[in-house]
Amino acid sequence: MINAVGREIPEEILKATGKEAFKGVYAYDDYEYKKAAPTVRTLNDPTRSKLVENIHDALVKCGIKDGMVLSFHHHFREGDYVVNMVMEEVHRMGIKDITICASSLGKAHDPIVPYIEDGTITGIQSSGVRGKIGEAISTGRLKNLAIMRSHGGRVRAIESGEVHIDIAFIGAPTCDEYGNMRANGGKSDCGVLSYAMVDAQYADKVVAVTDCLVPFPNLPASISMVNVDYVCVVDEIGNPTKIATGAAKPTTDVRKIMMADYCTKFVVNTPYFKEGFSYQTGVGGASIASTISLGKIMEERGIHMGLGLGGITTPMCELLAKGLVNKLVDTQDFDQGAIESIKTNPNHFEISASEYANPFNKGAYVNKLDFVILASLEVDVNFNCNVVVGSDGMITGAQGGHPDTAAGAKCTIVIAPLLQGRIPAICTNVTTVTTPGESVDVVITDYGIAINPRRQDLIECMKDVDLPFCTIEELRDKAYAMVGTPDPVQFDDRVVGVIEARDGTIIDVVRKIKDYEFEDEQ
């Protein structure tokens, strides 16, 4: 079946998953459904302890068995130890056919690849994957389909019962003996625990894993004791130097600075740039530079940001500290400055991933965005974006909040260099669609700026602005003229992954990379 972005979704995949093909960004607006519910085991006896000796003990008490779904969060980023720690014990116990439902997986989790190859892990559901896990999926070593969801889409899948978590393992920088978890106050602080909140609410069993047990009550709790079955104290839940790598610094790359300046000039010439506007940006060099340059103009003009949203970096926190931002609303901290800010600034708030981006609740924060500044591996002439699959066909990234914020914001801006190395980032067709062009308004490159023809209002308000505007086709043609038209990636027929739109429909599939055979030279 051909979906709304022109991608062919095999009928057998639709049948196997019980899914529909993507129909459009707002196809499920005003949709009514009934939420799922976990199985809860009560605790009335005040003498019964939640503390367990180790991960093995936690698994046994939770009734671990073949075929279960285990969940994890990624707030520790590349410093995470929890996934590997748990899966090593699952493997040692001889448990098979496990599905990992994680908010994201990274290179820190490369050690679990052998467990994919031996059948300990047969399913992965995540925002995305990097490193050797991505290679394992792309080369067909995962038994079942990998399912990629946005941050909002993951919450939707859990709350609707599409995914049922048997055991959630939640790494907590601090926790008390009854399970009240906080993201701060320990030796492995990560700022917030937003992605894990839905796991705690909907999993049948919840295990808090901490390296800093604190006196009861650990308040204010990010995750409450009422949702926690067991508490496991371990030596380390993460490497703090990789959880927070220090203050994000502005880029010195001239090309990125130029794109950031283009972005800022575009933003301030829209009708949305006014007192109390809302804004989200990513952690990339150009995005950080655009936040800094925007802050200077805000200060000059006396304009305040009403809401700063999303994954938070130090430059946004500095704007908050200067009084240029009224409220920061946070689902992930990317550096030490952001972690310190949420500890100390009363106008810096933690929210759940559902509040942030769930398309199946009664209204998420992303719907209130004026601007979102995003990056992309590829953008095609229909403004579709690819943030998951590399130009070599390998799964190498994550949807994150990309489709969620693009769908919600009044003005979605994607910053991408015209070329990624020798590979055109602006192309005829992206390798894989992860964010539909329907929700992308502007593409800013180092060689020009293209406005989506759907947005005639933006085209009109930019007619007298001195910026290098062109069509998206002209950008594509410039890229191809410089490095040639790229050869398409060669894939097998086998589908190894599904890219879900945030509403749970299938926007694209990922196929196995074709094996190459080389003939011996005679």
Segments the model singles out, each with a brief description of its role:
Residues 1-522:
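Conserved alpha/beta enzyme-core scaffold
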